[in-house]
């Protein structure tokens, strides 16, 4: 950048809360105290407003096509917020229930494991990176399934959409092992 001028950033202002969230979570063992403060916290407020805008626009686009899809857009935004908030208020719950999101924040590669509520899209995109056996979900859908079905699904996933592994050990993963 030029001396005396602000550095140009292609990141929109609204993304500053996202990157601040990532910094906070890395420093506080996956906790995000902004969720404790609630709507008074600028990052939490920005997340809620952003989700509301996206859900409202998507719902409006889907409404003429399908009222069910319109409701699904609203539900998905609310579910995302609930899961994401709970994960960062209860890290132990997150490690057990949504380990892919824990990996997203605490893994050495934060450009992996983008999904929050379910990991299946990361498998399709090839962005699921598992950092420790304790942080591997039962199956790529991220839901509890009977063992035989989960094993079959894991076999299919490994053949067509294999997850990547990293060697970096995480403190929580070591404690869980």
Feature names for model-found ranges:
Residues 1-146, 152, 156-157, 161:
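Membrane-embedded catalytic scaffold of the fatty acid hydroxylase/desaturase
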Residues 153-176:
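Membrane-proximal intrinsically disordered regions of secretory-pathway and membrane-system proteins
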